[in-house]
Swiss-Prot record:
Listed transmembrane segments: none
A GO molecular-function descriptor: thiopurine S-methyltransferase activity
Catalytic activity, EC: 2.1.1.67
Organism the protein comes from: Shewanella baltica (strain OS155 / ATCC BAA-1091)
Gene Ontology cellular component annotations, sorted alphabetically: cytoplasm
Main location: cytoplasm
UniProt-annotated binding residues for S-adenosyl-L-methionine: 10, 45, 66, 123
UniProt entry keywords in alphabetical sequence: Cytoplasm, Methyltransferase, S-adenosyl-L-methionine, Transferase
Annotated localization: Cytoplasm
GO biological process, one term: methylation
Name by which UniProt lists this protein: Thiopurine S-methyltransferase
Keyword presence, Transport: no
Annotated catalysed reactions: S-adenosyl-L-methionine + a thiopurine = S-adenosyl-L-homocysteine + a thiopurine S-methylether
Cross-referenced NCBIfam families: PRK13255.1, TMPT_Se_Te
Length: 218
C-alpha cells in the first residue's frame, strides 16, 4: 500500500472499507478483554472509524494513527468533536477529550506515544496491506505494543484472485504463521458475511469470511 494510493482513495472518497456502523465483532467481543475503563487503546490505520467512538464510550483513552489528513479531519467533523492540533515530530496530533489521533506514517510513529498502551484494536489495518507489505506492518505493530497488551483483531478472508483489494484477504494460516512469534492467538469467531457485502457479491466473490481474534503481546 503506497501512500499515494491511500491518499487518492480518500481524495476521491473511494472508501468502501469505511463502515457506517460499529463493527459487530467489536460490540460482541470487546468485553472479553476485561479492560479497566481508563485503559489506553491503540487503533492503527484508524481512518475515521466509528469504532473509536465506541471505545471512548467504554471509558477508554483512544490513540489512533492514520496516514491521511482528510480522514482525521472528517472523523472530528462527522462526529462534531472539537479538537486541538499540534505538531509532534513528523506527525500532526489531533486531540479531543478521550481521542488522540496522530496523522502520519505508522512506521515512523515514536514508541513513546504508545508506551502506556495496554490494549489495541485492528479491524481495518492488517487487511489494508497487500501480502508483500503485511508482515512488515505486523512487526511494526508488535514493536509499538508493550508486552502484555491485549487486543481484538478482525480480518476478512476470501479468494484473493477474485477481487483486487483493499481490503485484502488474510487467512487464519497467515495469522498463525506471521503473528504467533509476537502474540498469543485465540480465535473468537469466524462467520460468512458475503450477504452483507454487496461489493463482493457484485464481483462474484464466491465466499467471504470475517474472523475475530484475541491477541496478547508476548
Amino acid at each position: 500500500m503506497e501512500p499515494g494510493f491511500w491518499h487518492e482513495k480518500w481524495h476521491q472518497q473511494q472508501i468502501g472499507f469505511h463502515q457506517q456502523d460499529i463493527n459487530p465483532f467489536l460490540v460482541k467481543y470487546w468485553q472479553q478483554l476485561g479492560l479497566p475503563a481508563d485503559t489506553q487503546v491503540f487503533v492503527p490505520l484508524c481512518g475515521k472509524s466509528l469504532d473509536m467512538c465506541f471505545l471512548a464510550e467504554q471509558g477508554h483513552q483512544v490513540i489512533g494513527c492514520e496516514l491521511n489528513e482528510l480522514a482525521v479531519q472528517q472523523f472530528f467533523s462527522d462526529n462534531q468533536l472539537e479538537m486541538t492540533q499540534t505538531t509532534v515530530g513528523e506527525h500532526q496530533h489531533y486531540q479531543t477529550e478521550q481521542i488522540s489521533l496522530y496523522q502520519g506514517d505508522i512506521f515512523t510513529l515514536p514508541n513513546a506515544i504508545t508506551q502506556e498502551v495496554t490494549a489495541f484494536y485492528d479491524r481495518a489495518a492488517l487487511i489494508a496491506w497487500p501480502e508483500s507489505m503485511r508482515a512488515q506492518y505486523a512487526k511494526q505493530l508488535a514493536s509499538l505494543l508493550p508486552s502484555g497488551s491485549v487486543g481484538l483483531l478482525v480480518t476478512l478472508d476470501y479468494p484473493q484472485e477474485a477481487l483486487i483489494g483493499p481490503p485484502f484477504a488474510v487467512s487464519p494460516t497467515w495469522v498463525e504463521q506471521h503473528l504467533s512469534d509476537d502474540f498469543d492467538i485465540e480465535v473468537l469467531a469466524s462467520q460468512d458475511v458475503l450477504a452483507d457485502n454487496p461489493r463482493f457479491i457484485k464481483k462474484a466473490v464466491p465466499w467471504l469470511n470475517e474472523a475475530a481474534y484475541l491477541l496478547k503481546r508476548k
